[in-house]
Amino acid sequence: MASKALLLFVMLTFLLVIEMEGRILRVNSKTKDGESNDLLKRLGYNVSELKRIGRELSVQNEVDRFSPGGPDPQHHSYPLSSKPRI
């Protein structure tokens, strides 16, 4: 009888642990954004001004980036006579 009770206790404990680890928490992205805005306001920042500055900087900093032709095939190559010793 004691072994059945112990087995039942272990099974229930195991199921509780699995349930706690498998819980899915849904987080609304608007909530996170609202919390960060509230924090910035409490720290004394003007949130609308920060957003305006961010938009202006993103428009001003549009940079045309390009690759100069890919990797240099000779970068890691070496002549067979000068093979490094390991």
UniProtKB/Swiss-Prot annotation:
Region Disordered, annotated ranges: 63-86
UniProt-listed PANTHER family: CLAVATA3/ESR (CLE)-RELATED PROTEIN 7, CLAVATA3_ESR (CLE)-RELATED PROTEIN 5-RELATED
BP terms from Gene Ontology: cell-cell signaling involved in cell fate commitment
Keywords: Developmental protein, Differentiation, Glycoprotein, Hydroxylation, Secreted, Signal
Signal peptide positions (record): 1-22
Protein's name according to its UniProt entry: CLAVATA3/ESR (CLE)-related protein 7
Gene Ontology cellular component list: apoplast
Glycosylation sites: N46, P71
Similarity comment: family membership: Belongs to the CLV3/ESR signal peptide family.
Residues where Hydroxyproline is found: P68, P71
